[in-house]
C-alpha cells in the first residue's frame, strides 16, 4: 500500500460563501477495505484513490453524519417513494463508465447549476474515472437505476465492514416524479439491512447549506465528534 499525504491552500468554501476552506488529502494506492473503513469512521471521504477531509481554520460546520441502520424504519412517504419505483430496475455492480454515465452526469449538473447555482465542471472520461471508478478494489460499487431501459440514476457507494459509505449520486431531473435521489438512499438502507451492516455513512451535514442540510431528515443518526488519526482508537459518535 502506497500512501501520500498533502493539503490544499486555503480557498473559497464550496458550501458556505462567507467561509474559507482547506482540505487534507491522502492518496492511497491499493487501499485495503479495513483502512478505508477506519478512515471513513474518522470523517474522511473517498473519491477514487484520494481520501479527503476538511481542516478549515475557525470553522467546524462540516459534520460527518451516519444513519443508524438497525434502528431505521421507513416512513409513509418513504414507502410511497419505494412503491412509485416498483418497476424501476436496480443493478448493483462494479463502478462503470460509459457515454450514458457522462451524459447523465452532465445533465444532472446543468440542472443543479440552474436550480441551486452549483458550479459546473465538464468531466472527461479520464476525470470521471479518476473520481468515481479508480480505487474501487473489493468495496466500491455503483447502484444503477433504469426506467424502461434508460439509465436514470447512478449511486456510487463503498460497502465496508460496518456499513455503506455513500459517495455520490446523480440522476435525470426529467424523472423527478420518481424521487430518484431519495430512492437511491432508501436502497442503500435496504441493502445494509440485508447485509446486517450497522451504518450508512452519508458524508458531511452542513446545516446552512441547502444541498447538504437534508441529511438531518434521516433519523436516527449520529454525528462524529472531533477528528481522529488512524492510530487513535477513541472515536466518538453521538446522536
Swiss-Prot record:
It is found in: Cytoplasm. Its EC number is 2.3.2.29. The keyword Transferase applies. GO terms for molecular function: arginyl-tRNA--protein transferase activity; leucyl-tRNA--protein transferase activity. InterPro entries: Acyl_CoA_acyltransferase (IPR016181), Asp_Glu_LeuTrfase (IPR017138), N-end_Aminoacyl_Trfase (IPR030700), N-end_Aminoacyl_Trfase_C (IPR007472), N-end_Aminoacyl_Trfase_N (IPR007471). It comes from the Bacteria. One of its GO terms (biological process) is ubiquitin-dependent protein catabolic process via the N-end rule pathway. GO terms for cellular component: cytoplasm. Keywords: Acyltransferase, Cytoplasm, Transferase. Pfam families: ATE_C (PF04377), ATE_N (PF04376). Functions in the N-end rule pathway of protein degradation where it conjugates Leu from its aminoacyl-tRNA to the N-termini of proteins containing an N-terminal aspartate or glutamate. HAMAP family: Bpt (MF_00689). Belongs to the R-transferase family. Bpt subfamily. This is Aspartate/glutamate leucyltransferase. It comes from Campylobacter jejuni subsp. doylei (strain ATCC BAA-1458 / RM4099 / 269.97). The lineage of its organism: Bacteria, Pseudomonadati, Campylobacterota, Epsilonproteobacteria, Campylobacterales.
